[in-house]
Structures are given as C-alpha cells and as structure tokens.
Amino acid sequence: MRTSKYLLSTLKETPNDAEVVSHQLMLRAGMIRRLASGLYTWLPTGLRVLRKVENIVRQEIDNAGAIETLMPVVQPFELWEETGRSEKMGPELLRFTDRHVRPFVLSPTAEEVITSLVRNEVSSYKQLPLNLYQIQTKFRDERRPRFGVMRAREFCMMDAYSFDINKEGLQKSYDAMHDAYCKAFDRMGLEYRPVLADSGAIGGSGSQEFHVLAESGEDLIAFSTESDYAANIEKAEAVAPTTERAAPTQEMTTVDTPNAKTIAELVEQHGIAIEKTVKTLFVKASDEVDADIIALIIRGDHELNEVKAENLPQVASPLEMADEAQLRDLIGAGAGSLGPVGLELPFIVDRSVAVMSDFGTGANIDGKHFFGVNWDRDVQLGQVEDLRNVVEGDPSPCGKGTLQLKRGIEVGHIFQLGTAYSEAMNCGVLDANGKNVILEMGCYGIGVSRVVASAIEQNNDEYGIVWPEAIAPFTVAIVPMNMHKSERVKEAAEKLYAELTAMGIEVLFDDRKERPGVMFKDIELIGIPHTIVIGDRSMDEGHFEYKNRRANTKEAVEMANIVEHIKAQLS
C-alpha cells in the first residue's frame, strides 16, 4: 500500500477527551474517529487490525468445530420476553418500534435468536453436537460510554452458541472453546489469563473470563502464586485468615464515640486496630426473609463484594442499600453506629468476621460502640458466608500459595448456560429412545474490537503503538529518503516494494513528499514492526537501514541481503 493512495490520517496532538492510552493512540494513529457518544468509524488502518483479529478468531473457532452463520442485528422483542430478559437487561437494551408499531431491539447478544433458530431447525440427537457462531456488530446502550472502543455502545463481537444432548457433551464443547480462545490469544501475542467469573445477566452455571493484563484495566483479577487458580474479583473466593477463633481476652464494654461515624475515624480517635473492627451494612431483603432489610457484616478493612451479596437468596436483586430513614425507623440509630449486638433484624456474617474475637462494633445507639465483643458470648454467630472482596496476600482457595492481584481488561467470556434458555424457549430434540430432551447450551463471546484496544494498552511506548506482528496493520514499512529528488532511491524503493509484496508481505510504502522526520514519526506511531530506510548516503555505503520497532534497534543490512533479512525476521 502506498501512502499517497491511502488514508493515513495521523494526528500530532492527543485529543483532550481521550482518557486511556489505547483511545489516545487509536485516534492519533488514524485508526478510528468518533461519530457520536460511543460510536466510532473505523478508518483503514484500524480496520486492517480489526480484520486480522477477526480472522485469527474465525480460524481458531472453526478449528474447534463451530460453524459460522450470521444473524440479524435487529431482533423481535417477543423473543426477549420468552426468556424474561426483556426487563433483566434494563436500559442497556435499546428498544424501538417499526412503522407497524411492532417492538424490536438492537442486538446486545443473540441467545434468544439462536435458540429460536435451533428449536426450528434441529429435531434429532443425531444432529448434535452443534456449535454456531457469528462475527457481528452489537449494540448496548451504555450509560457512560468511555475509553474509545474499549467501552463503546456499538462494537464488533464474536458470539458462539453450542447445543448438546447432555452435560457431558456441554463440557466437551466448553473445553474445546476454552482451548480455541487460548490458541487465538496466543497467536495474537497477548499476555492474558483465563479466570473464574460470575455469569451475570447471561445466566447459567460455570463461566470463565479471559483478561488481557494491563495496568489500565477496569477489572481486578486474583491468581495464586503457586497454582493455576485465577478468578476475577467478583468471583474470587475469600478464605478466612485462620480456621480457629481465638479465645476471648476482654469483656464487652460500651465506649462513647460521638465523633466516629466511619471506621477510619473510630480507628484514629480510639486506637483500635482496623482489623479488630467490623462494619454492618444494611441492604434490601428478598421475599425469602421476613424483614424489609438484612444486615451484612464484614471486617472494617474489607470491602463488600456486591456480586456475592446479590447472589445470596436472602438479598434482593439488584442489590440496594437501605437508606438512613429506614435504619432510624427500624433500629433507632444511623449508619456508623450500627452492629449485630442486640440487633433484631436478620444478619449474615463474613467468614473473616466469624473467626474474630475481642472486636469493636456499633452499639445501635448514636455515638456509641461496643469494644471487646465476642461471638456466642455477646451475640450469636448465625449464618456465615463469603461476602467480601479478596485482598493481596489472602490464602488461595485452592490451598496452594497466596493471592496476587493484577488489573485486566476482559476480552472474552465463556458460559455453561445449561438449560436456562433452552427450557424457557422449549428447545429440545428427540433422543435415541424417542423422548424429548431439552438441550444443554454453552455461550461464548470475544469482544473483537475490544481486543484491538487491549492489545494497544499492553503494547505501547513513548513513540506510539508496538503491535504484536500477527495483528499489525502492516508488517513492513519502506521509508525512502528524498525519493522525489533521487531517482536511484526511488528505483530501489520501488524494486523492494515489488519484491516484498510479491512474497505476500503487507508493506506500507511511504511515498509522500514529506520530511523524513514526519515519515519516521508516523511509522512509529502506527506501530509497524519492521522498517527499511533507503537513502543516498546508505546506498553509497552499499546498505539499507533496518529498524525493529519492538526491540527499538537499527542495523545496516547489505542491499543485496535485505529481502532475506526480512524473511529471517518474519520466520
């Protein structure tokens, strides 16, 4: 490709509204342009990368035995009513009506559409297993689109759906897709981790996310220092620091704490260690509880894991905190002075709190706390659950090593849906005995456009993008110095361009009438892995200059050997 016939569209300055590195560099490198909030046009350079990611994903998903299809981005609303997700998805599901006032949605995912298709097309166990996928535009009406294509409203996604006669078949399909994901991300040259995850609004049982590791990642992932255990912060199991509760050494006393409305103030003003405090959080209760609100009790230095809390049958979903008026009406005190001692409302205790002794907690009277509290002496322990986020150094739940935390960007997710959708939509087949069997489903997604941004977050330097070779927009750049003034430079550049392109190598030939400094900066910004510089001075010495973008090195290569040198770099 010649730059004179290409839309390069690079920018010298970083746009003010670009927060993260990938957004900044995608704009500066001429990969995308914003059309509206969360909506982006992919320019030629960006589209080349997007297509390469797509093709790698397509090849590996094909190799896993899946079959490509293409479903409409517009879906009938009635399908979403069949599964009950029409309300569960909330405002992210964009709804509209056509001219006949028939309701539709813009597809954020396609479980309903694919299940409807399979129930009409597949009738016998002999047609199974079946795995169908598409690479298609999706739309989610994000409340706050940000970070460029990382969290856009419109995005490109690979979504696949497997159908099996039993759970054993589902596990095989799931494992095959897990392996396909690993092969795809390996080929892309990304540092990533598969982690245990919560199934969220998709539903189902087993689920794993694939995270590209990056400091800018929105998600925290926890992994063991001595095993393969890894989970996102929502799913990571928090193990108590000990299995034994120490014997009480203090009597319970009442302490005046008029100015301590937070754990931090309690610790600062009264000298109690933060790990000896507990905080009591009140949330709306579900219909399973004979109360309007329920208390969740965690250690003072820990954070409530809202996903774990919401998954408890006693807690209303979505999670909603009780307000101050409710607390005063039911307990007679406000937040900051509440605790389990004497509490006449149901409560659930975190594992770490269950092994505490001699701890401090609110006394359910404004401006007062109890110190020296002990379970089963001053208050009955009751139900114990995992309620908190893990922290660095926690014991790994696998029993090996401790947990470390890193930031990651979710680029893929795989689910074992089971019969959650197939049962709701009556999707079954006749088995070998002629009996109707509801199908076991799996669901698999890769955010193709998000992979592009994630790769940049992981691969950049002060000069621009440093693409992994497999997904770079071009493999080689040819930069001829003053070719419009030097005929022999032009001839050498044209000859080399013809040779490399004939070999199937993707080359960007910078034939612009520009200053060398401008050309070099653009090539580095775009992130092309290999650059060949051709100039009169180097030709006088019988060589071209070769630059390696990732290694940030340059070397003189004899003119006659340059093609072989490039071939060696690419092997």
Swiss-Prot record:
The EC number(s) this enzyme carries: 6.1.1.15
PANTHER family: MITOCHONDRIAL RIBOSOME PROTEIN L39/PROLYL-TRNA LIGASE FAMILY MEMBER, PROLINE--TRNA LIGASE
Family indicated by similarity: Belongs to the class-II aminoacyl-tRNA synthetase family. ProS type 1 subfamily.
Notes concerning its domains: Consists of three domains: the N-terminal catalytic domain, the editing domain and the C-terminal anticodon-binding domain.
Domain of life where this protein originates: Bacteria
Quaternary state and interactors: Homodimer.
Gene encoding the protein: proS
Any Pfam family: tRNA-synt_2b
Record's function text: Catalyzes the attachment of proline to tRNA(Pro) in a two-step reaction: proline is first activated by ATP to form Pro-AMP and then transferred to the acceptor end of tRNA(Pro). As ProRS can inadvertently accommodate and process non-cognate amino acids such as alanine and cysteine, to avoid such errors it has two additional distinct editing activities against alanine. One activity is designated as 'pretransfer' editing and involves the tRNA(Pro)-independent hydrolysis of activated Ala-AMP.
UniProt name for this protein: Proline--tRNA ligase
UniProt KW keywords: Aminoacyl-tRNA synthetase, ATP-binding, Cytoplasm, Ligase, Nucleotide-binding, Protein biosynthesis
Cell location: Cytoplasm
HAMAP family, per database record: Pro_tRNA_synth_type1
InterPro entries: aa-tRNA-synt_IIb, aa-tRNA-synth_II, aa-tRNA-synth_II/BPL/LPL, Anticodon-bd, Anticodon-bd_dom_sf, Pro-tRNA-ligase_IIa, Pro-tRNA-synth_IIa_bac-type, Pro-tRNA-Synthase_IIa_type1
GO CC annotations on file: cytosol
GO terms of biological process kind: prolyl-tRNA aminoacylation
Catalysed reactions, as listed in the record: tRNA(Pro) + L-proline + ATP = L-prolyl-tRNA(Pro) + AMP + diphosphate
NCBIfam families: PRK09194.1, proS_fam_II
GO molecular-function term, one example from the UniProt record: aminoacyl-tRNA deacylase activity
